[in-house]
């Protein structure tokens, strides 16, 4: 069984743990740097990206997270997690982890009162997935090797680049675990490659 960490500094941690377990993997809430060595993949949950960055800095997580990204182990960022993974953020000089060759606009769908749900078609996952968007970012631009998995209107809301997966929405806030299951499969495949 693969072991998937959920960065436990802030955000929808419990919901991700439940979704990982429902997808047949072991979930670990990561609160200490050394726990990164024990896991096969990592979820960066949605929350408030500025607060999350402050906590990442406070607990000296940034370099270990960048090292984890370079190790080739899969990472999945939802909402604020997508912002953490992006190489370029509109209106900001520096990236956070910067592992994905994508450009992201924060709060692109508006403030909290503009939160909404939308039925999405997600490549590799299926149709009619209910995307919960809460002050969501979206992907403005991608490198050639980034696969766009889903759009809402003309906006890219789910993308994959090798071992990295990012979504504007909160898949953990529904009882539909297909997006998490897709990430669990990515982690299993990556672990199999390491074994071979």
Curated annotation (Swiss-Prot):
L-glutamine binds at residues 47-49, 106, 134-135. Its EC number is 4.3.3.6, 3.5.1.2. GO terms for biological process: glutamine catabolic process; pyridoxal phosphate biosynthetic process; pyridoxine metabolic process. It catalyses: aldehydo-D-ribose 5-phosphate + D-glyceraldehyde 3-phosphate + L-glutamine = pyridoxal 5'-phosphate + L-glutamate + phosphate + 3 H2O + H(+); L-glutamine + H2O = L-glutamate + NH4(+). Pathway: Cofactor biosynthesis; pyridoxal 5'-phosphate biosynthesis. The active site is at 79 (nucleophile), 170 (charge relay system), 172 (charge relay system). This is Pyridoxal 5'-phosphate synthase subunit PdxT. It comes from Bacillus thuringiensis (strain Al Hakam). The lineage of its organism: Bacteria, Bacillati, Bacillota, Bacilli, Bacillales.
């Amino acid at each position: 069984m693969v072991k998937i960490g959920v960065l436990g500094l802030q955000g929808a941690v419990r919901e991700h743990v439940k979704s990982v377990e429902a997808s047949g993997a072991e979930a670990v809430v990561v609160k200490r740097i050394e726990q990164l060595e024990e896991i096969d993949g990592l979820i960066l949950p949605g929350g408030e990206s500025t607060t999350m960055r402050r906590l990442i800095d406070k607990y000296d997580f940034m370099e270990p997270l960048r090292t984890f990204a370079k190790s080739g182990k899969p990472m999945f960022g939802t909402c604020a997690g997508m912002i953490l993974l992006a190489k370029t953020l509109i209106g900001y000089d520096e990236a956070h982890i910067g592992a994905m060759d994508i450009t992201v606009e924060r709060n692109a769908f508006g403030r909290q009162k503009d939160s909404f749900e939308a039925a999405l078609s997600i490549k590799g996952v299926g149709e009619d997935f209910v995307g919960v968007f809460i002050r969501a970012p979206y992907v403005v631009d991608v490198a050639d090797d980034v696969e766009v998995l889903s759009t809402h209107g003309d906006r890219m809301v789910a993308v994959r680049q090798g071992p990295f997966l990012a979504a504007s929405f909160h898949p953990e806030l529904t009882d539909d675990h297909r997006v998490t299951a897709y990430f669990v499969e990515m982690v299993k495949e990556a672990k199999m490659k390491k074994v071979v």
